[in-house]
Amino acid sequence: MIRPVSGLFILLASILPLLASPRASADDRPYDVLRHNYAPYCTPGDDLAFPMKIWGLAKDQHTFWRGSRDLLFTWVKNHARDWLDDKDAYLVTHGDLHLGNIGTYVREGQLGATSFGPVDFDDTAHLPFQVELLQGLITIRLSARQNDIDLSGPRREEIAHALYDSYRKAIASDKSTHDLVSDERQITKFIDQAQKHTYDKTLGKFTDDTGHFLRYVQTRHAQEKGLVPKEILRPAMDRADDMAKSLAQAIERSPAARAAFRYSDVATMRHSIKDVVLRTRLESVGSQGLKKYLVLLDKPLKGLDMDVVMYVKQEIPSAAERAGAIPMDPRSPGQRCAEDMDVLTNPSAYLNCWCDIGKESYWVSFKEPWSDEIELENVRNYPKLLEMTRVWGSVAGAMHRQQGSAIAAAILQRLNRPELFDQLRHRSTLYMATLDREYADFMSDPRARAEAAKAQAKLDAAKAQVTAEANAR
């Protein structure tokens, strides 16, 4: 049963795992840092929790980079003190703006209308803009490495200038993110494709014909090939009372949500819950292993005469906080995520709420078919990489510029100093060398292999069950 709790209580519950033992040091091995900073927020004994996080990180170096931001911010804390000391350069940053965290999202207004910009705000943090730019240059260079795109000769310099110049152009502009990227051919096609779907697609993906969630999310082709499911959905109706109270709490906090929902009181919310599952999405890595609930509600939204899948996602202190690069945010993690998302998106999202469940904090939205992220596998050659580099700069610049003219002026002043461009190039190279060492160490660590093996056993069992069910039909 959920009882009212103060914001201070939730904050303390969020940071106590980090205070329980000495902070991971720069000399710790990567596995040690991740176990210290991340594992305390995962359910002990659940092999689809922290072991699944380790399993995801072991996929390849690019995925390791995406999911190990604690290591980056530990490095920044020790090697970029001049940036961290530049207090006039601080603003709300996304904190994890790789290409897969850029895409379409459902915006405020008519249901199904979309905009383009940053998505997935788990790691928002108050940081100097230079740190966000550093992450951008690293992510572009690693994207090239992942897709075997040659950056020798003048290309590495050209990529760095493309990111820097597109970011500066966006900071100096008054255009929206959508307008800034409208000339990029890949993005125009991407946005048009996302708007063609109806909500039936989401229900068909996650639910059966009886008003319940599927146990596995997988295409029929993948079933026939005997592949591991893309998602595992574990029954969690024992959390239905908690979900009803948390959803009512989240909707009550948001005027936009109150306007969108037909009902928001706890009793009606509980009566309308058809099913609850705990979601594990194999392609996730940044928040892999944390609790993510899907809640099937009976026709809750105005203007949509069908059931809706709500998404209740556990939030924890950002990677920058966990690494000690910045102080702990006084807000609960769910509140930070939702409020920072409002700051970083324009127009605002259709549904963006937060709630607290016991000692945990959650971000609340809904699953829909119109949001989509850029997929790295589609960035297949140098011209496409160059285009995505400009897109990254435009998205980051618009996101930062909309926080006020004083911030924009401070950023432009620093961008006009040649030494900043040189620092970004140099520090991206230094960190990539560090990343090479850390990834090699992680992959050779027997403790990481043992954790990943626990998750793999669960996935193998799921694959066997899906195959057996397909053969029985």
Predicted regions and their residues:
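N-terminal secretory signal peptides that target proteins for export/translocation
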Residues: 1-5
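Bacterial N-terminal signal peptides
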Residues: 7-18
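Conserved ATP-binding subdomain of kinase catalytic cores across diverse folds
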Residues: 24-47, 56-95, 99-197, 263-451, ...
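Acidic catalytic cores of enzymes that act on phosphate-bearing nucleotides/polynucleotides
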Residues: 201-274, 279-280, 284-285, 296
